[in-house]
Amino acid sequence: MPLKDLPLDAQPREKLLARGPAALSDAELLAILLRTGLAGKGVLQLAQELLDDPVRDSATGRSAGGGFGGIAGLLHASSQDLQRIKGLGPAKRAELMAVLELARRALAQQLREREVFDSPQAVQHYLQLHLAGRTHEVFAVLFLDSGNRLIAMEELFRGTLTQTSVYPREVVLRALHHHAAAVVLAHNHPSGSVQPSRADEALTQTLKAALALVDVRVLDHVIVAPGAALSMAEQGLV
């Protein structure tokens, strides 16, 4: 149904202005960005289809169509990923990518201005924006100063859907480069599960021991997936 055929108070833009953004669904917020749909497909339907779960190839686990699995997956999509969606021209793709970058910068600014563990949820959201939509495993590190504020984030290793090789020596060298006092380790699980594996637990302890040799503390190891995040520290695994 075209937006103009909806009652005025049900149209996303008017609803946002009257009741605030929290009153809108993800699809309604996205529809405001998209503005128009396609022939035979209203903008709300297009927005919902973009947010639907992806269809994955059973053999490779890679996306074979469908949506992006929610806001985090959509906003992490590359320009090439967005090009496959009929109706998303260059202007709409640019707007979506700009929104993602603004969200990243806002979260990074928050982390730099206060102690990271004053808001562990902000850390998890920041990592989800960076890692949750990836179709391959990525291992990243947040380097922190003595006040637990963010110095930098680096993606250090990439792997297949099932394995990422992580070299402790490289993590130690990057920590020394940034003069970090502490780190938060992070990686994604493209499978969608955030439960840590035995390999995740072993890697955490290996890196913790290596970084302790240069007086750098491991504060947490966060695992992210589309729509979810898990703190290994909160599970007693760090």
From Swiss-Prot:
Swiss-Prot/TrEMBL keywords: Hydrolase, Metal-binding, Metalloprotease, Protease, Zinc
JAMM motif, short sequence motif: residues: 187-200
Segments forming domain MPN: 116-238
GO molecular function annotation: metal ion binding; metallopeptidase activity
InterPro entries hit by this protein: MPN (IPR037518), RadC_JAB (IPR025657), RuvA_2-like (IPR010994), UPF0758 (IPR001405), UPF0758_CS (IPR020891), UPF0758_N (IPR046778)
Example GO biological process: proteolysis
Residues where Zn(2+) binds: 187, 189, 200
One Pfam family from the record: RadC
Family named by the database record: Belongs to the UPF0758 family.
Protein name: UPF0758 protein Ajs_3450
Species, as recorded: Acidovorax sp. (strain JS42)
